[in-house]
């Protein structure tokens, strides 16, 4: 059986660029924030690690030469992970998208489209678990069933709260993510860039289904307004308490809510 890591303990990169910059970064179980001036290699560090993780998360045999990970437990050979990037570029492969009858214009739209599929699967899985619990005949079956549905409700409450200034609310009876705004129905693709970004992050974390995941985020705050930047880390940890965040940022707002001690400067993990 595949043995999955709970989290990454250490990232070592022998040379970030050809023959220079040896990186050794010891990580916190929950929150790790990489800072530094532009061009110092923050995104490169994240990219080198992500590139070495196979699609299914198997890592020792795929790691780029000179990149080493220590994980907990040490014998684990697999990592569940997700990647959030900030740049919302126009879609390059429009041909592929045209086969799907939707107005997907940017990479973030495509990401949301894929997340909608995962969200449907997630709901089916939760529904099956709820049925199994209720059929078990255990005295606390109703309580257990309610606990299973709590993360989805928490996610919906979070999004409604974030979007309240524009009057948007999630339509809770719909299977897919859809919004109501003053009587009009909206799809996620009609949201603003910042709304799409925060929705994509929270939806990604919800469908992880409380499992141990590593969430790589490369400057996720770029299109988020100030208040959302401050809330970001707390919301992610609330939605999946078993997550480990490894992120880069330029924004002081992201760390304002009690995360300043989790900030690491690239220079501090560079061995000369």
Positions of the model-derived regions?
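Phosphate-coordinating catalytic segments in nucleotide- and nucleic-acid-processing enzymes
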Residues: 1-18, 24-26, 47-193
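Switch/communication elements of ASCE P-loop NTPase nucleotide-binding domains
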Residues: 1-56, 172-272
């Amino acid at each position: 059986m595949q043995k999955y890591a709970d989290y990454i303990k250490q990232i070592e990169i022998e040379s970030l660029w050809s023959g220079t910059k040896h990186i050794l970064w010891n990580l916190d179980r929950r929150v790790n924030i990489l800072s530094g001036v532009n061009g110092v290699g923050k995104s490169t560090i994240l990219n080198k690690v992500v590139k070495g993780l196979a699609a299914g998360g198997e890592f020792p045999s795929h790691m780029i030469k000179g990149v080493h990970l220590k994980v907990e437990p040490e014998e684990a050979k697999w990592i569940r992970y997700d990647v959030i990037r900030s740049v919302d570029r126009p879609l390059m492969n429009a041909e592929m998208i045209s086969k799907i009858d939707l107005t997907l214009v940017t990479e973030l739209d495509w990401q949301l489209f894929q997340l909608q599929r995962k969200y449907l699967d997630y709901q089916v899985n939760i529904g099956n678990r709820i049925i199994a619990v209720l059929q078990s005949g255990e005295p606390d079956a109703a309580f257990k069933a309610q606990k299973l549905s709590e993360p989805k409700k928490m996610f919906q409450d979070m999004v409604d709260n974030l979007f309240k200034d524009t009057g948007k609310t999630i339509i809770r009876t719909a299977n897919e993510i859809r919004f109501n705004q003053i009587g009009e129905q909206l799809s996620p693709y009609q949201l603003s860039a910042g709304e799409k970004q925060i929705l994509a992050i929270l939806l990604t974390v919800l469908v992880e289904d409380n499992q141990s995941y590593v969430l790589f985020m490369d400057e996720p705050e770029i299109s988020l307004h100030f208040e959302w930047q401050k809330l970001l880390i707390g919301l992610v940890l609330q939605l999946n308490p078993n997550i480990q965040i490894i992120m880069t940022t330029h924004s002081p707002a992201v760390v304002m809510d009690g995360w300043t001690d989790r900030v690491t400067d690239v220079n501090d993990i560079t061995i000369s």
